[in-house]
Amino acid sequence: EGETEQCNCGGYGCLEQAASATGIARLARKLLEADLARPSSLREVKNLSAKSVLDAARAGDLLALESVETSCRYLGWAMAGITMVVDPEAYLIGGGVSRAGTFLTEKIQRYHDQLSPMATKKAKVLLATLGNDAGIYGAAKLVLG
């Protein structure tokens, strides 16, 4: 969508810019800046984070919900493209955003299913059981063999 901000990796238009914890907060920030008259409880938050956006979305804040929906749409649609080629059984959502639970996975699943109706089986969007600790376990496994 004509992304002008550079991603942490140095690229532009990366999925990470929208479909991640930092992406959710970034999208909310952009929405707040785009319409200064639009009401949102997020205007009172000093350090905007994915958690604050997700909490506001759960509480019914429409701007926060738009940010979350946009992030889930990008991720769900990207997964749908992968599903049509690879046909996986499941996708695991981990990291910090996994704490949002089914509030996120149900939205991601809905967007995924919109664009993958021809897949031989429906890939499930699930929560990784290790949550934000997955990286630590992976690093330990590499070191310990």
Predicted regions and their residues:
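ATP-binding/phosphotransfer module of carbohydrate and carboxylate kinases, centering on a glycine-rich
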Residues: G2-G145
